[in-house]
A protein has these predicted regions:
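Domain-terminus/edge residues, biased toward the C-terminal soluble/receptor-binding domains
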Residues: 2-7, 17-24, 29-54, 194-195, ...
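Active-site-adjacent loops and short helices of periplasmic peptidoglycan-processing enzymes
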Residues: 25-216, 220-224, 285
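Repetitive helical segments and hydrophobic/amphipathic motifs
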Residues: 11-12
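Structural motif marking the loop-to-transmembrane transition
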Residues: 1-7, 100, 150
Length: 322
């Protein structure tokens, strides 16, 4: 009996010790609790984050600031928010109002493209419907019944920033439920840790808002997981013919596209209410970078000033890319 009592006492002590360790690990302020299965998923960078909602919020660590070299003035910009981030080292090289929520207009189409890529095959057929054409469309030649693969549709979204195509993609990918598509956009933003971001529609004509820091997170995720999305945006001009023999001429809305050495991809945004936005991903010998301008009366001038500032401050040349 005495031996049985000792064994029981030892078992109780072991249970108390294990419980104390669990509570310490669970509630320690310096180590946030993450479910065990989520920890293993965090190491699989090829998995879409939206697959594991909502547990993967803030998986990516915040970008950290880097002091500006002494004697070099900050770039002159008119934007409400702007910044330059080294996506390779995760360093913010310069930023102004990086966490302020600003209207982003058609930068929304980056998230639209990401959600579509994660939830539909490249060969998915996008058919233009009458409901898609009740919005101002860049390409006036689009007609009801025009058919495109999803990859072809991405060219419309990311080169000419076509609004009707964005509506058609969202409607098709979620089987007619555009509201569910927008909900997935917001859930994906939350999973990525984009805490200053909110989407109302897949086009960018509503009150879609984000911040410089959040757009840097999105750009890094796209480049790391779906780099083809940025490659779609790299054409200054593209002639596309559909299976029905219809020809479409797509012109890039980024008018300084060919003036940026090493460019990987870009996306513009503009409405009279929120002003102009421009996100540019480029590569140099020191890594991959993203320049972001939000709410600017001169988005192209601001971006040019940021890139010029970087060339002088970092002693790096923008010539390692395409």
């Amino acid at each position: 009996m005495r031996r049985i009592g000792l064994i029981a006492l030892f078992a109780c002590a072991l249970l108390l010790w294990a419980g104390a360790r669990f509570i310490a690990d669970r509630f320690a302020g310096s180590v946030p609790y993450v479910p065990p299965y989520t920890q293993s998923l965090q190491n699989k960078s090829t998995e879409p984050l939206s697959t594991f909602l909502p547990w993967l919020a803030h998986v990516y660590e915040p970008f950290s600031p880097t002091p500006t070299p002494q004697g070099i003035p900050d770039p002159v910009v008119q934007a409400a928010g702007a910044g330059l981030v080294n996506m390779t080292t995760r360093q913010t090289l310069w930023a102004a109002n990086p966490d302020g929520s600003e209207g982003i207009a058609s930068l929304t189409k980056l998230m639209t493209s990401l959600v579509a890529r994660e939830n539909a095959a490249s060969s998915t057929i996008i058919t233009i419907g009458a409901e898609d054409l009740n919005v101002d469309s860049v390409n006036k030649d689009l007609r009801v019944g025009d058919r495109f693969t999803l990859d072809e549709a991405f060219h419309f979204l990311l080169i000419s920033s076509d609004n009707a195509m964005a509506k058609a993609v969202a409607r098709t990918v979620f089987h007619g439920n555009t509201s569910a598509f927008v909900d997935r956009m917001n859930r994906t933003a939350a999973a990525l840790g984009m805490t200053h971001t909110s989407y109302e529609d897949p086009v960018g004509l509503g009150r879609d808002v984000s911040s410089v820091s959040d757009m840097a997170i999105l750009a890094r995720y796209i480049e790391n997981h779906y780099p083809d999305l940025f490659s779609f945006s790299r054409y200054a001009h593209l002639t596309m013919m559909t299976e029905q023999g219809r020809v479409f001429e797509l012109t890039n809305t980024n008018v300084i596209l060919n003036q940026i050495p090493g460019i990987i991809g870009s996306k513009t945004g503009y409405t009279p209410e929120v002003g102009g936005s421009l996100l540019v991903v480029f590569e140099t010998q020191k890594g991959k970078f993203v320049s972001i301008v939000l709410g600017s009366p001169d988005r192209f001038g601001d971006t040019s000033n940021i890139l010029s500032w970087y060339s002088h401050s970092a002693s790096d040349t923008l010539n390692a890319g395409n």
